[in-house]
Amino acid sequence: MPLSSDVYLTTSLDGGFSSAAHFQLQASGTYLADFHPRAFALIDLETYHSAYMGKRHLKEELEAQIPDSHPFLYKGDVFLFLHREGDGDIFSELAEEFQLKILISAPIDDLFTLPQLYRTAREALELMRDARFHGEAVCSAQQLRTPLLLKNLEGRSDLIPPELRRLAVHDREKGTQYCETLYHYLTCCHSLIKTGDALYTHRNTVLYRIRRLQDDFLIPLEEPSLHADLLLGVSLILFESKGPDFFLRTPKNEA
């Protein structure tokens, strides 16, 4: 007896196919044989509720608003496919109405790559469940790449240079913003104006802080080969002190 398409999908998500050819052979005869979705979405159901008496269930709502999405339950979350560029726009209203958190995956090149894409998407959705997360109810995996990386490195104080650990202690005890200044200075390509804009402060204040970073805290800003270490270290500090929200990227700012 042929297996259903959902069984092939769950087997694929579980990494049960040894090759793309094996997957294609097994899925032949189902809609998956000629199926080319743009992406998929994961919907967290922890706080799901139906707000009104007689309201259609979430599954019916998804099928009505996103045709051919084939929603099904996988490991406690709703998994569904997206085909059109505007499909993701529908989620904001649904997230508000049904109290959902929704993660949109990176683009799908081949259905055989679903296990890798799913792993990242599931970790990103877990990040959205974090009590420190106060971002939008609908996010893309691309938006969460940086905080997700830092989440996976959380607690690795051994990756933070000693001079940055001392800087973090100074910020914490004195209420200063040297770690934030260093982060924005590095990510803004050493532009005083852009760093000032990011911090909502004057460029002269930024210049003063940069000089103190070099002279008083011995941060090696004149050594380009150390900039990657500095950026990673200060990012880990800020992730611990400010949480994932500090690193959220909004779609309108993406190139």
At which residue positions do the language-model features occur?
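CheY-like receiver
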Residues: M1-S4
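Cytosolic nucleotide-utilizing catalytic cores of signal-transduction proteins
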Residues: V7-A255
